[in-house]
Amino acid sequence: MTIELLDSMGVVDTSNAYIRKAVAAPASDVLGRIANLETRLARSAAEIDAAQAVRYRVFVEEMKAQVAPEAGRRKRDIDSWDAICDHLLVLDTSIEGDAEEQIVGTYRLLRQDVAERTGGFYSASEFAIGELLSRHPGKRFMELGRSCVLPEYRTKRTVELLWQGNWAYALKHGIDAMFGCGSFPGVVPEEHALALSFLHHNVRVRDEWAVSARPELYRTMDLMPPEAINPKKALAALPPLIKGYMRLGAMVGDGAVVDQAFRTTDVLIVLPIGKISGRYLNYYGADAGRFSSPVS
């Protein structure tokens, strides 16, 4: 995924009234809990600001992504989509202090109806999303992005809560398909030849779900012939997030894109709701009720 290289005029001010209105939410909107962790949407501009700080710690301090000087000064990963997206959070409620100090993970969610009113999807800067959307005029799409979790919370529980939140949100808004960028570290696709080739030959989107990288950015994923691929080793070489998408039943677009600012090689994940594995629907609950029981 790409970090926008914004100047100070392009940095979103989370204190403005528009964002305050956009993220206003009641205190009863918790989507799931596991022990001391809970997931819900951001309720205030201050919580969005705290989520941007978590993203900065992961994307810039850990992954060495490049950001604009103003974003670096503020130590926030910020772009223009923050003002229009919903921000899914995972909080550790055992941490003393305000909610802003408890945020340990975040996801950014952008519904199609919102994107069409406000300038489009983030992923469209790398992939030909418009072609996919035009093929499904009656379906509702949602983009997932800016997923990150602090290192000490990269556990099964945290990932489960993020997916619980995504699933509950998708059900609430009648979403038919989700998509978003998945990233490999580094800007040399050939270094990930095994994993990229495995995705290309085994889970590439086809027919009505076909979508590809923008022609001017397209990098082939077909780097090894099928007979040369060891599936077990290929699966082990996949980044955890992409592997998680595959387990759910996701497909991958045709072609990768090198993101120089983020220092990653990106692929497009496409997950139609109707293709989600029955195993995971049973696990999370068809009504997203798996982890939604109130605290006793």
Swiss-Prot record:
GO terms for biological process: lipid metabolic process. GO terms for molecular function: ornithine-acyl [acyl carrier protein] N-acyltransferase activity. Its EC number is 2.3.2.30. It catalyses: a (3R)-hydroxyacyl-[ACP] + L-ornithine = a lyso-ornithine lipid + holo-[ACP] + H(+). Keywords: Acyltransferase, Lipid biosynthesis, Lipid metabolism, Transferase. Gene3D superfamilies: 3.40.630.30. It comes from the Bacteria. It holds the Pfam family Acetyltransf_5. Disruption phenotype: Disruption mutant is unable to synthesize ornithine lipids. It can still induce nitrogen-fixing nodules on plants, but it shows delayed nodulation if compared to the wild type. Pathway: Lipid metabolism. PANTHER family: GCN5-RELATED N-ACETYLTRANSFERASE (PTHR37323), L-ORNITHINE N(ALPHA)-ACYLTRANSFERASE (PTHR37323:SF1). Catalyzes the first step in the biosynthesis of ornithine lipids, which are phosphorus-free membrane lipids. Catalyzes the 3-hydroxyacyl-acyl carrier protein-dependent acylation of ornithine to form lyso-ornithine lipid (LOL). Belongs to the acetyltransferase family. OlsB subfamily. This is L-ornithine N(alpha)-acyltransferase. It comes from Rhizobium meliloti (strain 1021). The gene is olsB.
